[in-house]
């Protein structure tokens, strides 16, 4: 009887451990981004992307994102924010570039939030983007580091999709600029 009970408990523990690995990764801080088109709520993956999460929260806590626009906006790909005012003046980052965390096991799937960067993999600062589709080409691969996922939209994906459908054009050297700016009014921890 004791052996049966011990075996049952062991199997239950193994089963619980397996179930915990199949559950979505733990989410920590939540950020509410209020835009001129509606509200987007984002859960951040601090455990998997601690550097990107701390960086993003530092910008959020400083009020940096208020007044910035979404640009570029590319239907079927992504919407990006965190860098430009509506007159297309770049707001200079307040923190140094961060280490690329695209090797964290998270993929650029629809609704995920990732760090934008230049060709230099370790150049991400304030700009981020929301994937509109699964963008496997942005994940880490044999070609090198990808774009680090550090969060996911948990409410307001309909707003993200509406932003993706706005009419865009060119402003100076910039393409995919919304004709009617989509403004980030605020980004705050929930």
PLM segments and residue spans:
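Cyclophilin-like peptidyl-prolyl cis-trans isomerases
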Residues: 16-190
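Positively charged n-region of N-terminal signal peptides that target proteins for export
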Residues: 1-4
């Amino acid at each position: 009887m004791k052996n049966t009970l011990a075996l049952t408990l062991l199997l239950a523990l193994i089963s619980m451990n397996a179930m915990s690995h199949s559950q979505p990764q733990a989410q920590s801080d939540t950020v509410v981004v209020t835009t001129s088109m509606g509200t987007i709520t984002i859960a951040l993956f601090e455990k998997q992307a601690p550097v990107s999460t701390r960086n993003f929260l530092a910008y959020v806590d400083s009020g940096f994102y208020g007044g910035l626009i979404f640009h570029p906006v590319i239907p079927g790909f992504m919407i990006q924010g965190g860098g430009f005012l509506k007159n297309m003046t770049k707001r200079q980052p307040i923190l140094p570039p961060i280490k690329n965390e695209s090797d964290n096991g998270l993929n650029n799937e629809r609704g995920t939030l990732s760090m934008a960067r230049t060709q230099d993999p370790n150049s991400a600062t304030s700009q981020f983007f929301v994937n509109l589709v699964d963008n496997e080409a942005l994940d880490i691969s044999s070609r090198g580091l990808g774009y680090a996922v550090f969060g996911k939209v948990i409410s307001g994906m309909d707003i993200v999709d509406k932003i993706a459908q706005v009419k865009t054009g060119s402003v100076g050297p910039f393409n995919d600029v919304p004709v009617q700016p989509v403004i980030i009014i605020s980004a705050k921890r929930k």
